[in-house]
Amino acid sequence: VVLGPASDGRNAAANNKASDLIRQICCGYGDCGFVPNVCV
């Protein structure tokens, strides 16, 4: 993760990408106790 105001957009994009991947894995395999409501 890159820190600083100039990198906020990149961090948001990376976080969104990670969230999408987590959501796919969790919703596909149903093994996501560490991420509440990930499939909502």
Curated annotation (Swiss-Prot):
Disulfide bonds join C26-C32, C27-C39. The keyword Transferase does not apply. The keyword Disulfide bond applies. Keywords: Acetylcholine receptor inhibiting toxin, Amidation, Disulfide bond, Ion channel impairing toxin, Neurotoxin, Postsynaptic neurotoxin, Pyrrolidone carboxylic acid, Secreted, Toxin. Residues 1-23 form a propeptide. InterPro entries: Conotoxin_a-typ. It is found in: Secreted. One of its GO terms (cellular component) is host cell postsynaptic membrane. Expressed by the venom duct. One of its GO terms (molecular function) is ion channel regulator activity. The modification Pyrrolidone carboxylic acid is found at Q24. It comes from the Eukaryota. Alpha-conotoxins act on postsynaptic membranes, they bind to the nicotinic acetylcholine receptors (nAChR) and thus inhibit them. Belongs to the conotoxin A superfamily. This is Alpha-conotoxin-like Lp1.6b. It comes from Conus leopardus (Leopard cone).
